[in-house]
Regions:
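Conserved ATP-binding subdomain of kinase catalytic cores across diverse folds
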Residues: 1-151, 190-194, 221, 233-234, ...
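Phosphate/ATP-binding catalytic cores across multiple sugar-kinase/actin-like superfamilies
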Residues: 161-172, 269
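Short acidic-aromatic active-site loops that bind/stabilize oxyanions
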Residues: 128, 147-162, 227
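Conserved helix-loop functional segments at active or binding sites
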Residues: 140, 144-148, 167, 171-174, ...
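Secondary-structure transition/capping motifs at alpha-helix termini
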Residues: 29, 70-76, 145, 171-182, ...
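Beta-strand segments within the central parallel beta-sheet cores of soluble alpha/beta enzyme folds
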Residues: 78-83, 183-186, 252-256
C-alpha cells in the first residue's frame, strides 16, 4: 500500500509502505479484518531499506497497542509477536554507533490500514481516477451508510474521518498518550492509533513533552499540540479530496466544526476524569486552574487522577499531593496555597 505524506509539516512525497505486508482479510463477528505483517523483510515500496524490525520496537508496539485497546482508545491491534532468528543492525540512538539486535515480526490486525497518505499520493500525482477509486472503495467497505456516487457523499466521508480523528485524539489526551510522530502517513483514515514508533506516556503533567528525540527542538508533536496537529493533518486530507468535491466551503465548515467539537469533547473528557456528571458554568475555570496547578511542580498525572478518586475532604488533599508530586519534601508555600484553593473549589463542586 504505497503512500506519501507530510512529515513534520513538510511535504515528503512518496514514502513507501511502512515495511508492512498485507496477508489476507477475514470476517469475524460480521466485521472484516485485515491481517498484516510488519518487519518480515523487503516490500514493494521499501526501496533500499531491509524491511526488517527488531525485537525491542516490536515488543513496544505489541504491548502498547493492546494496552490502548483495553484503555478504550481506538487502535490497531497486535495478533502475535515472533522472533525471526536473524540479527538486524540498527543505530538505536542515531549517534553513529550501530549494533546488532534480534529480529522480530509483529502480526497486527485492523479493519483497515489506510492512511491519509494513501489519498495524498494520488492527489499529488493528479491521478484523480485512482483517487476516486480509493475513496469509493473506502466508503463502500468502511462507511457503507454513505452514498459515494455524489459530491455530498465525499463531503460526508470527510466529516466522518474528521469526527473519528478527533475522538481518537481526545482519548490520547485522556490517558496521557503522546504519539510522537503524527505525520499524515501515520494518520488512520478510520481514526485508529497506528504506527507505534517513538511514542510515550506522560509521567509529570506537561503539555510541552514529547518522547521523540528528533522533535526535541521544535516539539511539533508535543502532548498539548496533538489536537492542533490532528486539525492540520485534516487540512492536508481536505486538500487531497478537494478535486473530487470542487468546493472549499463544505470542507472548511467541517474543519471549523472540529475546533468547536474539540472544546466540547475536551471539557466532557476532563469532567469525566474529575467525576463530574453534570454541567456547571464554572467547570471550565475549575479545569483551567487544575491544569495550571499541575504545571507548578512535577506532578505525576496518572498517580494524581488515580488518588483523586479517593478524595473525601480537604485534609485528604494533602495526602494526594504528597504522593503525586515527585519532590514532595520541598514543596513551596505558594504551591500549597494554590492547591488548597483548588481543592476547596473542587469540594464545593462535588456537592452541586
Amino acid at each position: 500500500m504505497c503512500y506519501a505524506g507530510h512529515q513534520f509539516g513538510n511535504w515528503a512525497g512518496q514514502l513507501g509502505d511502512g515495511r508492512a505486508i498485507n496477508l489476507f482479510e477475514v470476517e469475524h463477528n460480521s466485521k472484516n479484518w485485515k491481517v498484516q505483517l510488519k518487519g518480515a523483510g523487503e516490500t514493494p515500496y521499501s526501496r533500499n531499506a531491509d524491511g526488517l524490525a527488531v525485537l525491542r520496537s516490536s515488543i513496544r508496539e505489541y504491548l502498547c497497542s493492546e494496552a490502548m485497546f483495553h484503555l478504550g482508545v481506538p487502535t490497531t491491534r497486535a495478533l502475535s509477536l515472533s522472533l525471526t532468528g536473524d540479527q538486524v543492525i540498527r543505530d538505536v540512538l542515531y549517534d553513529g554507533n550501530p549494533a546488532l539486535e534480534k529480529g522480530a515480526i509483529v502480526s497486527r490486525v485492523a479493519p483497515s490500514f489506510l492512511r491519509f497518505g494513501n489519498y495524498e499520493i494520488f492527489a499529488a500525482r493528479n491521478d484523480l481516477k485512482n483517487l476516486k477509486i480509493l475513496v469509493d472503495y473506502t466508503i463502500k467497505y468502511h462507511f457503507p451508510n454513505i452514498d459515494s456516487s455524489s459530491k455530498e457523499g465525499y463531503i460526508n466521508f470527510f466529516k466522518y474521518v474528521s469526527n473519528r480523528t478527533l475522538e481518537m485524539i481526545i482519548h490520547w489526551q485522556r490517558v496521557g498518550f503522546v504519539h510522537g510522530v503524527m505525520n499524515t502517513d501515520n494518520m488512520s483514515i478510520l481514526g485508529l492509533t497506528i504506527d507505534y514508533g517513538p511514542y510515550g506516556w506522560l509521567e509529570d503533567f506537561n503539555f510541552g513533552w514529547t518522547p521523540n528525540t528528533t522533535d526535541n527542538q521544535n516539539k511539533r508533536y508535543r502532548y498539548g499540540n496533538q489536537p492542533n496537529i490532528g486539525l492540520w493533518n485534516l487540512h492536508q486530507l481536505a486538500n487531497a479530496l478537494y478535486p473530487l468535491i470542487e468546493e472549499a466551503k463544505p470542507l472548511e465548515d467541517i474543519l471549523n466544526q472540529y475546533k468547536v467539537d474539540f472544546k466540547i469533547k475536551s471539557l466532557q473528557m476532563m469532567q469525566s476524569k474529575l467525576g463530574l456528571f453534570t454541567n456547571d458554568d464554572d467547570d471550565l475555570n475549575l479545569i483551567q486552574q487544575l491544569e495550571d496547578n499541575l504545571h507548578l511542580e512535577e506532578t505525576d498525572m496518572t498517580i494524581f487522577f488515580r488518588l483523586l478518586s479517593d478524595f473525601t475532604d480537604l485534609p485528604s488533599s494533602l495526602e494526594i499531593m504528597s504522593a503525586a508530586v515527585y519532590k514532595s519534601n520541598n514543596i513551596p508555600k505558594d504551591f500549597k496555597k494554590k492547591w488548597g484553593n483548588w481543592f476547596s473549589l473542587y469540594s464545593k463542586r462535588l456537592l452541586k
